[in-house]
Amino acid sequence: MRILGIETSCDETGVAIYDEDKGLIANQLYTQIALHADYGGVVPELASRDHIRKTAPLIEAALQEANLTAKDIDGIAYTCGPGLVGALLVGSTIARSLAYAWNVPAVGVHHMEGHLLAPMLEDADNRPQFPFIALLVSGGHTQLVKVEGVGKYEVMGESIDDAAGEAFDKTAKLLGLDYPGGAALSRLAEKGSAGRFVFPKPMTDRPGLDFSFSGLKTFAANTINQAIKNEGELSEQTKADIAHAFQTAVVETLAIKCKRALKETGYKRLVIAGGVSANKQLRQGLANLMDDLKGRVFYPAPQFCTDNGAMISYVGYLRLKHGERTDLAIEVKPRWPMIELEAI
C-alpha cells in the first residue's frame, strides 16, 4: 500500500508518499517563510493562495522522487484540521479531487495526530512503543497527551491561553528579531548568560498539568521596557540574556509538567513533537529529565518537527489500512479535539 499525503494546514506545503513495505519514499516541502516575513506572521489569505500554486507541483515532484505514477498510489491522506480554514480547504479540495479522479480512497488526518506519531517514522531503535506521554508543543498548541495506542488519546493538560510557540514568537517580536521569531530567539538565547534575568515558571506552583504562557509574555515585555529605560537602546548581549531567561523559563515549565504526567501515569517513555520540539535546550532539558527518571525521550528527526507531508502520509496509511474513509464531501475542521478520533 502506497499513500500520498498532503499537508496545508498553515504556512508549509508538504507532500509525501509512504510505502507499507519501504517506509517513506518521497518527501517534498515548501515553506512560505519569505512570503510572510514582511508581515511578521502568517497572513491566512496569502497562505491559501500560495498553497494553490505549490501543491500540484509538489505532488508531481513527489511522484518523480519515488519513481511512481498516479496508478501506483493506493490512497490519499490530507490534513483535515485543525488549522487555517482557507489553507485546509486547498489541501482537502485537491486531495478529494485526486482521489475521485484516480479512483482511490481518501482520509482526512488530524494535524496534531500527525505530529504525535511523527517519531514513528524513525528506525526501529528510535521509535517509541506504546504507551507513552506526548508533549505536543508548537505555535498553535501546547498539550500533554496520554497515548495508549493510535487514536487512544487522553489530553491530560493544555495551554489555557497562548501556546508555547506563540509566546516564543511574540517575545521575539518584542526583541525586534526577524521572522520566524521562535527560531531566531532560540539562536539568540544560546549567546545569553544565565542569572542576569530570572523569569517565572507559570502555573508550576499549583497542582495540575495545564499551561499558561500569556503572563510570561507580559513579563518579557515589562523586562524589555525596563532594560530600555536603563540602557536606552538594548545591547545585543542584553537581548541575548533576556532570550536565554525566557527560553529557560519555558523549558523548565514544560519539564516540570512532563515530570508530573509521567509520575501520574507511571510511564517511562516521553515523546516530544511539534515545531518547538526542534529547540535544542528543550531537547536537552527533557533528556536530562528522562535520565533522572530512568526513562527515555523520543522525538522526530528535525525535518519532521515542523509541518510536513510525511507525518500525514504515515497516519493516513494507518487509518486507511484500518478501513477508514472520508466521503466525497469537502469538509475541514479548523478546531478538532483529539478525543474525537477513532481508536484503531
Curated annotation (Swiss-Prot):
Q: Would you say which domain of life the source belongs to?
A: Bacteria
Binding positions for substrate per the UniProt entry: L136, V137, S138, G139, G140, D169, G182, N279
Query: Which is a GO BP term held by this UniProt record?
Result: tRNA threonylcarbamoyladenosine modification
Name the lineage.
Bacteria, Pseudomonadati, Pseudomonadota, Gammaproteobacteria, Pasteurellales
Q: Which family does it belong to?
A: Belongs to the KAE1 / TsaD family.
Q: List the PANTHER family.
A: TRNA N6-ADENOSINE THREONYLCARBAMOYLTRANSFERASE (PTHR11735), TRNA N6-ADENOSINE THREONYLCARBAMOYLTRANSFERASE, MITOCHONDRIAL (PTHR11735:SF6)
The record lists the catalysed reaction(s) as:
L-threonylcarbamoyladenylate + adenosine(37) in tRNA = N(6)-L-threonylcarbamoyladenosine(37) in tRNA + AMP + H(+)
Function of the molecule: Required for the formation of a threonylcarbamoyl group on adenosine at position 37 (t(6)A37) in tRNAs that read codons beginning with adenine. Is involved in the transfer of the threonylcarbamoyl moiety of threonylcarbamoyl-AMP (TC-AMP) to the N6 group of A37, together with TsaE and TsaB. TsaD likely plays a direct catalytic role in this reaction.
Q: Name one Pfam family in it.
A: TsaD
Q: Relay the cofactor remark from the entry.
A: Binds 1 Fe(2+) ion per subunit.
Q: Which NCBIfam families match?
A: gcp_kae1 (TIGR00329), T6A_TsaD_YgjD (TIGR03723)
Residues binding Fe cation, per UniProt: H111, H115, D307
Q: What is this protein called?
A: tRNA N6-adenosine threonylcarbamoyltransferase
The record's top EC class is transferase
Keyword entries, A-Z: Acyltransferase, Cytoplasm, Iron, Metal-binding, Transferase, tRNA processing
Cofactor(s) annotated in UniProt: Fe(2+)
